C-alpha cells in the first residue's frame, strides 16, 4: 500500500460511522492457525493421531470419519486446547481492536476459531460456526446448542492423563445422544441471534458511512466477499 493509499484509508476509518470487519482464513493463517498446513505444528497439536489416521492437516482432522467417538473428541479437545483455551491475543487482533476503537462495529467471519469473541469482539456473525459449540447428533435442529469450552478442557486433561473413557464423551442434555461440533455441514445450526444482529447492523448503517475492513479473504470467496461487494 502506498503512503497516499494509507492516508486515504485512515481518513475513511476516521470519518466512518461504523466499521464492518470481514475476515476469512488468511487472518487465521497470519495468527499462526493454518488449517491446510502439513508442518511440525500439526504433530505438536494432534500428537499420535497424525500417524494413526494419516492426517495431512487440521482441516482433514476436523472432517475425518473416526472409527470411534473417543478419538474424535481427543482430536477436537487437542485442537481447541491449543488454539482456543490457550489463545493469546495476537498483534493482528490488537491492531483490529485499535482500529475499531469506540466506533460501532460488526464482525462477519467464516473463521471457526472463535478468536474474535475471545478478545472481546462479540458483535459477531460466525457464518460457519465455531469449534467451541456442539449440537445433538440425533436432533440438531430441535435441541439446544451446547457451549463446550470447559468440557473440552476436561477431555484434554483426561486424554493427557490417560484416563479418558466413553463416559466423558459430550452428550446432549435433552436426549443423551452424542454431540457433534456445530460447524459447516448438514447438521450445522446457524446462530439466529447473530444473523438478526448482523441484519440490524446493516440496516442501521446502510445509508451512512460504513467502512468494510476486509481481512484475509481470497478473491474467490463466495460466502463473504461476493455478497459484500
Where is each model-derived feature located?
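Conserved catalytic alpha/beta core of Sir2/sirtuin-type deacylases, generalized to analogous enzyme cores
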Residues: 1-229
Amino acid at each position: 500500500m502506498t503512503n497516499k493509499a494509507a492516508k486515504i484509508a485512515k481518513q475513511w476509518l476516521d470519518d466512518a460511522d461504523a466499521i464492518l470487519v470481514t475476515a476469512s482464513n488468511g487472518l487465521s493463517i497470519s495468527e499462526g492457525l493454518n488449517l491446510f498446513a502439513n508442518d511440525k505444528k500439526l504433530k505438536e497439536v494432534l500428537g499420535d493421531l497424525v500417524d494413526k489416521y494419516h492426517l495431512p492437516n487440521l482441516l482433514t482432522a476436523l472432517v475425518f470419519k473416526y472409527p470411534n467417538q473417543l478419538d474424535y473428541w481427543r482430536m477436537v479437545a487437542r485442537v481447541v486446547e491449543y488454539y482456543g483455551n490457550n489463545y493469546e491475543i495476537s498483534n493482528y487482533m490488537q491492531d483490529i481492536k485499535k482500529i475499531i476503537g469506540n466506533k460501532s462495529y460488526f464482525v462477519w467471519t467464516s473463521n471457526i476459531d472463535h478468536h474474535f469473541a475471545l478478545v472481546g469482539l462479540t458483535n459477531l456473525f460466525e457464518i460457519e460456526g465455531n469449534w467451541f459449540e456442539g449440537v445433538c447428533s440425533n436432533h440438531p435442529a430441535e435441541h439446544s446448542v451446547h457451549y463446550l469450552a470447559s468440557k473440552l478442557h476436561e477431555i484434554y486433561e483426561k486424554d493427557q492423563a490417560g484416563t479418558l473413557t466413553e463416559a466423558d464423551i459430550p452428550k446432549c442434555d435433552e436426549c443423551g445422544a452424542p454431540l457433534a461440533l456445530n460447524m459447516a455441514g448438514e447438521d450445522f445450526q446457524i446462530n439466529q441471534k447473530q444473523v438478526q444482529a448482523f441484519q440490524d447492523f446493516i440496516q442501521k448503517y446502510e445509508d451512512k458511512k460504513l467502512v468494510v475492513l476486509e481481512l484475509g479473504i481470497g478473491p474467490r470467496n463466495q460466502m463473504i466477499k461476493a455478497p459484500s461487494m
